[in-house]
Curated annotation (Swiss-Prot):
Predominant place of localization: membrane
Topology relative to the membrane: Multi-pass membrane protein
Keyword check for Disulfide bond: no
Its biological purpose: NDH-1 shuttles electrons from NADH, via FMN and iron-sulfur (Fe-S) centers, to quinones in the respiratory chain. The immediate electron acceptor for the enzyme in this species is believed to be a menaquinone. Couples the redox reaction to proton translocation (for every two electrons transferred, four hydrogen ions are translocated across the cytoplasmic membrane), and thus conserves the redox energy in a proton gradient.
Gene that specifies this protein: nuoA
Organism: Chlorobaculum tepidum (strain ATCC 49652 / DSM 12025 / NBRC 103806 / TLS) (Chlorobium tepidum)
Protein name per the record: NADH-quinone oxidoreductase subunit A
Annotated compartments: Cell inner membrane
Known partners and oligomeric status: NDH-1 is composed of 14 different subunits. Subunits NuoA, H, J, K, L, M, N constitute the membrane sector of the complex.
Residue intervals passing through the bilayer: 7-27, 63-83, 90-110
Family: Belongs to the complex I subunit 3 family.
A molecular function (GO) term: quinone binding
Catalytic activity: a quinone + NADH + 5 H(+)(in) = a quinol + NAD(+) + 4 H(+)(out)
Keywords: Cell inner membrane, Cell membrane, Membrane, NAD, Quinone, Translocase, Transmembrane, Transmembrane helix, Transport
Amino acid sequence: MDQTLSGFGTVFVFLVLGIVFVVGGYLTARMLRPSRPNPEKNSTYECGEHAVGSAWVKFNIRFYVVALIFIIFDVEVVFLYPWATVFKQLGAFALVEVLIFVGILVLGLVYAWVKGDLDWVRPTPNIPKMPEMPVRRSGKANG
């Protein structure tokens, strides 16, 4: 038990020292740097060209959906690699667990596919237009 605590203590000291170095470097640079703001420094740098318009560019939300799906399956590979290296020692139970894991991810992919998140060009819906609101025989509309 004493070795376990010393192992966690080492990790904790390493974490604290890492945070101290990052925060200390940031604060030292902040205190030592000169502060002379001007419009040239505050403008967006575009390879020597004068900035035209805003630096903010609107992206289609589909980029983010595809990126999230990619990250999910990329992390899946990270989880499957250690399993694949020790598959023979783990046995059939580990195989069933991995098949369930992959099955859940495949269900998520099928859901995204059926929902249309993977279709880059979505068809525009055909909404029927009514010429005017139906009127009752009495002449009053919905009354």
